[in-house]
Amino acid sequence: MTSSANLRPDIVLIGAGIMGATFGTLLKELNPSYSMMMFERLSDCGQESSQSWNNAGTGHAANCELNYTPQRPDGTVEITQALRVNTEFDLSRQLWSYLVTKGAIPDPQSFIHPCPHMSMVWGAENVAFLKARFQAMSAHHCYHGMEYTEDGAQIEKWAPLTMEGRDPAEPVAATRIITGTDVDYGSLTHLLVAHLKAQPDFDLHYNTEVEGLDREPDGRWRVTFKDVNSGERHSVSAGFVFIGAGGASIDLLQKSNIPEGKGYGGFPVSGIWLRCDVDAVTQRHHAKVYGKASSGSPPMSVPHLDTRVIDGKTSLLFGPYAGFSTKFLKHGSLTDLFGSITLHNIGPLLDVGRHNIELTEYLIAQVLQTHHHQFEMLKAFFPNAKRADWKEAVAGQRVQVIKPYPDGGGFLEFGTEIVPAADHSLVALLGASPGASTAAAIALEVLEACFADRLTDDAWLPALKRIIPTYGIDLREDAEACRASRAATASVLNIDNI
């Protein structure tokens, strides 16, 4: 705390995960003169949900995740949500390509790798659903190149482990799109934070926990923080505060005391993976294969068998198995859930409990699952799997948003919720899904919510369009812009394009 800029930063970023790193990077590109401070409770960046093994690492483009494409009563499939997620991933690709081109990210293969995305189902009813889904998606330019088959021999060519040992009489179907990716969001977070650290007027503080957010008379924010090792406390006066602290965001939003945050709560869902590092197995599977979730299960619990490339090493991941913990962070406290309950959100919390019995029953069943039952679930995807080849790994915590109704009730929101202060001086990010893949789209939403007056031709808009060339263009409607953008970003990122 040696200079006046350090004592009165323009921007404070709370949380050194993929969201804080992405938003900080974008904001610094738009206004390099901003002074910024980033606070992280842990000893390094990207150690919670952004950490490589704490998430699935899918470049979520809604290619293979069946929960984005619900079936209508007439048997047809709704793809509106899938198209939104699909084109939001394009925004991330454009931001990453910009950073690679300018040299901020030296090697794209340090965080992203080509990996086909597949959906696979079995049973006549599920096959009919996947066929209807393919018919709807393949007719749209955003899903150009998607393949479909009900031929077990063809599926075996695409993903051999999924078919070997399977009953040949069982109906199966799969879709594949070869333009999919595997993304190491932990590595990407480190790359973004390293780039930020190299910028002028950027201060990074690890092992630092934000304890207070208080309004000052001039409208700025008094941010009080503690060194978790020494216990020393300091404070700064911030012009704008970005709360991107994952599961800790609920608590920080409550500390800010903004009226817009009243009533929000959190529901934590934990996850467990099975992981295989045996080369003889991992070398025979190159895809992310998503199945169909059980009825009542949350979106993050769609089972999938994935190729993962982390630190240059290829592994396989299967899961997740959902669970319940009262922690809001993997490195959090068992009292997190109880500490988050206030007079303002207890009504919405109780309302959600009453109206989500199916989810509650699902989580209880998952928690009570034995290792045998978990492995049987893997064998539904990989019939010849050997127990000795797989070990258990604990995923990151996902805190789903409980959003208040005006009447005092509430509902469970599985997306990402942006909660800005009325004067745009503070914003909190809540929720977990779809998460890191759409970090650029979420960062743009924050810009539009809190910096709308700067998004003009005589301010930030020209620079923003250099970073995100399709900003302001709906890629769901403009097929040519979509094709051109994907060709350009695939070339820079060295990923597949068709």
From Swiss-Prot:
Any one GO BP annotation for this protein: tricarboxylic acid cycle
Keyword GTP-binding: no
Cofactors: FAD
Pathway membership, UniProt: Carbohydrate metabolism; tricarboxylic acid cycle; oxaloacetate from (S)-malate (quinone route): step 1/1
Enzyme Commission identifier(s): 1.1.5.4
Superkingdom assignment: Bacteria
Reaction catalyzed: (S)-malate + a quinone = a quinol + oxaloacetate
GO molecular function: 2-hydroxyglutarate dehydrogenase activity; L-malate dehydrogenase (quinone) activity
Record keywords, A-Z: FAD, Flavoprotein, Oxidoreductase, Tricarboxylic acid cycle
Residues making up the signal peptide according to the UniProt record: none
Matching Gene3D superfamilies: D-Amino Acid Oxidase, subunit A, domain 2, FAD/NAD(P)-binding domain
Family indicated by similarity: Belongs to the MQO family.
Protein name as annotated: Probable malate:quinone oxidoreductase
Organism encoding this protein: Granulibacter bethesdensis (strain ATCC BAA-1260 / CGDNIH1)
Lineage of the organism: Bacteria, Pseudomonadati, Pseudomonadota, Alphaproteobacteria, Acetobacterales
